[in-house]
């Protein structure tokens, strides 16, 4: 497995990571035994970067990932996140919080659920518009000083906010949705990451699983799957995106791989102006198979 250096502080991870959100909710039924087997299989195939968050489950995902990786802690880089709040009585109701006291308490809670002494990469999941980023990152920097966190990251951040954050403490990674159908980071964020020496971690490089080519009908989404309520998968949008998948399937076939393998490669080897490691999760993804470019073409 190829590796990538994220940031300039010494964080090195596998070029492909495993995003664990879908193991606990959002994408239909959960199967903890299957998820645990997937986590261990990923390690065996050379993946070192594993991504979770306190709200996934909520909280269940950190427990699952922590238990699965406990015996091989020294072989993995564990990333988790704080900052999105969910109402336990109504999980669809959400808010954000970046207050310094919350940063510290959220970290302690995540460490307890994971069963780890240190979080390798700690992201602010979403920026709190009511709290200056300097205050939030200042509290995160305190966690580094205390030995509870090794490296800092931000998720879905603007270039301007990233600059302010880096002035407080080095940011090793920025995470944002980026795939063959989501190109927003190309509008300034990738360039800012390169300028500041910040690594870039694309999430959902498989387009919420849609770019795998395994979804053909709206009915393919299980009851309770959040994609049933997403505008991307409604009405004529569904068919337009199916048309895009057909083109991606042709591209993958020309390169001797599957759409599931093409997506992460595209997210990390497009003209990305920053070191990148993609995180993805799907039951059909086979990360051990490489995807090669056909003769006389550019990958």
Which residues does each predicted region cover?
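Active-site groove signature of glycoside hydrolases
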Residues: 111-129
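Short, acidic/polar
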Residues: 30-42, 98-114, 158-164
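N-terminal binding-site loop/beta-alpha segment at the start of enzyme catalytic domains
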Residues: 1-77
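Beta/alpha (TIM)-barrel catalytic core signal, keyed to glycine-rich beta->alpha loops juxtaposed to Asp/Glu
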Residues: 127-298
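Conserved beta-strand positions
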Residues: 18-20, 52, 121-124, 154, ...
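Alpha-helix N-cap and loop-to-helix initiation/capping positions
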Residues: 30-34, 60, 64, 94-102, ...
């Amino acid at each position: 497995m190829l590796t990538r250096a994220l940031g300039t502080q010494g964080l090195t991870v596998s070029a492909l990571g495993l995003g664990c959100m879908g193991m606990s909710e959002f994408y239909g039924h959960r199967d903890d035994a299957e998820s645990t087997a997937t986590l261990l299989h990923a390690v065996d195939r050379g993946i070192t970067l594993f991504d979770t968050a306190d709200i996934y489950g909520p909280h269940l995902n950190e427990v699952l990932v922590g238990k699965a990786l406990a015996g091989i802690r020294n072989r993995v880089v564990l990333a988790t996140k704080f900052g999105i709040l969910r109402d336990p009585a109504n999980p669809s109701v959400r808010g954000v919080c970046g207050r310094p006291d919350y940063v510290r308490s959220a970290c302690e809670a995540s460490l307890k659920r994971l069963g780890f002494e240190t979080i390798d990469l700690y992201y602010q999941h979403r920026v709190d518009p009511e709290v200056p980023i300097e205050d939030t990152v200042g509290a995160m920097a305190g966690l580094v000083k205390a030995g509870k966190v090794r490296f800092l990251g931000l998720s879905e951040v603007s270039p301007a906010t990233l600059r302010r954050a880096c002035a407080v403490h080095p940011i090793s990674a920025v995470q944002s949705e980026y795939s063959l159908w989501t190109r927003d980071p190309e509008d300034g964020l990738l360039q800012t990451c390169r300028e500041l020496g910040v690594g870039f971690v694309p999430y959902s490089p498989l387009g919420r699983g849609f770019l795998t080519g395994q979804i053909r009908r709206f009915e393919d989404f299980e009851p309770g799957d959040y994609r049933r309520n997403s505008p991307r998968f409604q009405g004529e949008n569904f068919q337009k995106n199916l048309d895009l998948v057909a083109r991606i399937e042709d591209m993958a076939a020309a390169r001797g791989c599957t759409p599931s393998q093409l997506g992460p490669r595209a997210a990390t080897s497009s003209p990305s102006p920053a070191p990148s490691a993609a995180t993805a999760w799907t039951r059909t993804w086979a990360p051990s198979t490489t995807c090669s470019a056909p003769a006389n073409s550019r990958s």
